[in-house]
Curated annotation (Swiss-Prot):
Pfam families: Pyr_redox_2 (PF07992), Pyr_redox_dim (PF02852). PROSITE patterns: PYRIDINE_REDOX_1. Glutathione binds at S30, R37, Y114, R336. One of its GO terms (molecular function) is flavin adenine dinucleotide binding. SUPFAM superfamilies: FAD/NAD(P)-binding domain, FAD/NAD-linked reductases, dimerisation (C-terminal) domain. This is Glutathione reductase, mitochondrial. The gene is gsr-1. InterPro entries: FAD/NAD-bd_sf, FAD/NAD-binding_dom, FAD/NAD-linked_Rdtase_dimer_sf, Glutathione_Rdtase_euk/bac, GSHR/TRXR-like, Pyr_nuc-diS_OxRdtase, Pyr_nucl-diS_OxRdtase_dimer, Pyr_OxRdtase_I_AS.
């Protein structure tokens, strides 16, 4: 009987010219693939549509190649300090082409692993660009598909400003297409993407200028983190040139191919590469969402509820196109939980968008989880918030001429001083934060932090030995 129903369903699908799936996923990025493969574990039929390389932003032009380039730039810093540790090493030459070739080969292998994963999970991989038709089906290269449930996970693309000559620059995705290290670079933006790219280029030897609209970078992060990184960029020993309160007004390309960047505070000449890193827009316009009643905000982000439902029944969305926490692990977690809810009877399974840890691969590093000081004050009131802070010199730089500071902050609330925010600036922040994120998620208190015996000598021990709490200013 079950086989008869399957044959009947397939016959109807063929006769109607529409191929049907229990779950149709539009977008082969981290969130879409994670949700598709998890759905297959529950025995449903799944189709996945993608027009570009599998893996989406993270694998191809985001966190993975970015981390490779960050690691590369770290080696330049190590070489800088080698003499102070007794090594006779100098940086004679850096070959951008070598690391680009190795990085691109690594990404290509990951693309292949994603495709193998889909095949191994029996997810049907449909290559092409998707758009909703008037009848509610999804069209790809002239063929029609329909999902009993349809997931939109198409991600986003970099924003290009409406400025005269803006087309002479490249976007943050284009950074990974550069064939050589630019002799002089201008990066525009104050968010984590701009900060990371500028730091990599500056440390690898490009004369790099970071242009920010206001007086600080990372203004949405905790004030301590924003202040510390901005101050570090202002140091004479930092190879980066920071231009505060600066906006680009015009870009002029000369006959020699070099750019002149006119700004509100001056002119930067002989620029080989201009990189726009001012934000990202969702890739939703080409989907024709209005045909199926999916509502978006004014920026084009898909509006979803706490269960990832859109305004259209049976159509859901996760990832960057929802505008919530543009982070790969968030998209993966939301996508997998969604599949559990839709296909495994877990009707209340959803991602809670709280205490999500993140790291900025800046120079120095930043790690953060939970509420900022300002958010805690707004949520609980100033009288309920207690702050613990520490600023010190990491041991790595105890014997080097070059010095870097580290800074840490715990944001605690209530009489029991529940830790609701952990913010870390300095070497090692990326690797130390994950464990503290678990503690924050579990609701640990300052007393429990204090009862933890420190690992010495480490930077992380500061987080369990801080004393002298203060109130917000």
């Amino acid at each position: 009987m079950l086989r008869f129903r399957c044959i009947l369903s397939t016959s109807r699908s063929i006769m109607s010219g529409v191929k049907e799936f229990d779950y149709l996923v539009i977008g082969g990025g981290s969130g879409g693939i994670a949700s598709a493969r998890r759905a297959r574990e529950f025995g449903v039929s799944v189709g996945l549509i993608e027009s570009g390389r599998l893996g989406g932003t993270c694998v191809n032009v985001g966190c993975v190649p970015k981390k490779v380039m960050y690691n590369c730039s770290l080696h330049a810093e190590f070489i800088r300090d080698h003499a102070d540790y007794g090594f006779d090493v100098t940086l004679n030459k850096f070959d951008w082409k070598v690391i680009k070739k190795s990085r691109d080969e690594y990404i290509k292998r990951l693309n292949g692993l994603y495709e193998s994963g889909l095949k191994g999970s029996s997810v049907e991989y449909i290559r092409g660009r998707a758009t909703f038709a008037e009848d509610g089906t999804v069209e790809v290269n002239g063929a029609k598909y329909r999902g009993k449930n349809t997931l939109i996970a198409v991600g986003g693309k970099p924003t290009i400003p409406n400025i005269k000559g803006a087309e002479h620059g490249i976007d943050s995705d284009g950074f990974f297409d550069l064939e050589d290290l630019p002799s002089r670079t201008v990066v525009v933006g104050a968010g984590y993407i701009a900060v990371e790219i500028a730091g990599v280029l500056a440390n690898l030897g490009s004369d790099t200028h970071l242009l920010i609209r206001y007086d600080k970078v990372l203004r949405t992060f905790d004030k301590m983190l924003s202040d510390e990184l901005t101050a570090d960029m202002d140091e004479e020993t930092n190879p980066l040139h920071l231009h505060k309160n600066t906006q680009v007004t015009e870009v002029i390309k000369g006959d020699d191919g070099l750019l002149t960047i006119k700004t509100t505070t001056g002119v930067i000449e002989k620029v080989q590469t201009l990189i726009w890193a001012i934000g990202r827009d969702p890739l939703t316009k080409e989907l024709n969402l209005e045909r199926v009643g999916v509502k978006t905000d004014k920026s084009g982000h898909i509006i979803v509820d706490e269960y990832q439902n859109t305004s259209a029944p049976g159509i859901l969305s996760v990832g960057d196109d929802t505008g919530k926490f543009l982070l790969t692990p968030v998209a993966i977690a939301a996508g997998r939980r969604l599949s559990h809810r839709l296909f495994n009877g877990e009707t209340d399974n959803k991602l809670t968008y709280e205490n999500i840890a993140t790291v900025v691969f800046s120079h120095p590093l930043i790690g953060t989880v939970g509420l900022t000081e300002a958010e805690a004050v707004e949520k609980y009131g100033k009288d309920e918030v207690t702050l613990y802070k520490s600023r010190f010199n990491p041991m790595l730089f105890a014997v080097t001429k070059h010095k870097e500071k580290a800074a840490m902050k715990l944001v605690c609330v209530g009489k029991d001083e529940k830790v609701v925010g952990v913010h870390v600036f300095g070497v090692g922040s990326d690797e130390m934060l994950q464990g503290f994120a678990v503690a924050v998620t579990m609701g640990a208190t300052k007393k429990q932090f204090d009862q933890t015996v420190a690992i010495h000598p480490t930077s992380a021990e500061e987080l369990v030995t801080m004393r002298g709490g203060v109130k917000p200013e």
